[in-house]
Structures are given as C-alpha cells and as structure tokens.
Amino acid sequence: VIKHSKNRKNISDFSLNDVWSENKILKKDFKKLHGFFWLFTLDLNSSKKDVQNTLLKWFKKYHNYNAYSWEIDLLSKRIISWISNTKITYEGSDEIYKNEFDYLIKKQVNHLINEIDRSEKIDDKIIGCAAIILAGVSFNDKTKFLNYGLSLLKRIINNTFDRNGFPKSRNLRQLTLFLKYFILIREWLKESQNDIPEYLDEIIYHLGQAYNLISKDSAATFLFNGCLLYTSDAADDET
C-alpha cells in the first residue's frame, strides 16, 4: 500500500519554489503530487520546516474544494500521508500551523464522508474508509469518524466479498489491495488501543489464505474467474 523507498530522499533535494504552480502537468503526476504519498520517500531527518512550508503553501492554495485536487482517491491518500508522517508534517510547528493542519484534516474527512457513498469505484471506497478510520483514531474528539469508518468498513466487506471471503470481482489486484488496507486498519486500531472487530480479523484471514495460495505460483496466475493472466509481482506493485 505504502511503498517505502530504500533510498530515502531529503526534502532539500527537491526544488520547492514552484511545487504548487499552475504550470500544466500530466494528470498522473498531478495525482502523485497532491496525493502526498511522496512524503513516505523522505528521510525523517529532512527539515521539518521545509516540509511544513510546502504543506502550508498547499493549505493556502487548495484549502477549499477543488474538483481535481479533492478527488476521493487523492483526498484519502493525502489524509493518510499527512497523519502517518506527523514527525515531519506536524511536530515542531507553531500553534497557528497545527490548528490549520487539524482543521484541514477534519474538513477533508467530512467532505470524504459526504461523498464516498456516491463513488462507484470500490478502490476509492476502501482507501477512503481507511483514511476516515485513521483520522478517527488520531483525534480524541472525533469518535464519529471512527464509528462511521467502521460502519462503512462492514458495509464494504458485506457488499464486496462472497461467503468464502473472496472478492466477488475475482480480481487478484483487488484482493491484494484490500488485504493491505485491511491489515493497515487493524494495525491502526491496535496501536490506538481500540477494539478490533471480529469481521475484520475474519476477512483478513480469508484474504490471507487466498493470497498465500495464489502466490505459490509466483510466475503467473489466472484471476479467480480464469479470464485474465496476472502476475503476483505485478499485483504487489499496484498500490
């Protein structure tokens, strides 16, 4: 889900002056930039000031809804990235910055809650669900985020998997994606000392069994429905 680069980069290695410029960039690059998963590639010894200044520029320019930078998948990844990297995105900042950071996290989560049921993309739903739950365990005053996230998680599981715990789509890439995010959610709940729902443990078990079975053939594997050839290595590289 979250790739950690073996060769960590320092924030000072990047040119940040025009990072949020209006210059046209490819949609793929735009999504990578605004999803903020690049934060996971940074050395934690990077300058907190530089990282936070970069976020502050984003705060000022994109704090209101924008159809492009507030897409569900970008919004979800951004929430996960900001919260997961608080050592460089939050710690050591002044109260004004912290208040703005907290406000924008909550604003984005509220928007996500209002929009996620309208999305027809199951990938967006699970990433969004994970982001809502992470916000819920990160803010003491936002148990409603956690409660909503867990309720959404249960609905996703009920609607997406068959009685044996297999994705109804029979898609290996989705199996891998769900397994990774479910494990992340369980770890966040455990670390925050929240109860782990039995249904989450059960689906992780079933998906893990399926993944282990399929991964034994590391060269190539057909999807469960036999329609397409898909490599397990490629699945690992997806998200």
Residue ranges and their predicted role:
Residues 1-13:
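Extreme N-terminal leader/anchor segments
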Residues 12-23, 27:
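Long, low-complexity, highly charged intrinsically disordered regions
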Residues 26-204:
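Aromatic-lined, polymer-binding surfaces characteristic
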Residues 210:
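Metal-ion/cofactor- or nucleotide/acyl-coenzyme-handling active-site neighborhoods
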Residues 213:
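Anionic-ligand-binding alpha/beta catalytic cores of soluble enzymes and soluble regulatory domains
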Residues 218, 222-229:
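N-terminal leader/propeptide and maturation segments of large enzyme subunits in energy/redox metabolism
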Residues 230-239:
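Single conserved hydrophobic/aromatic residue that forms the stacking wall/gate
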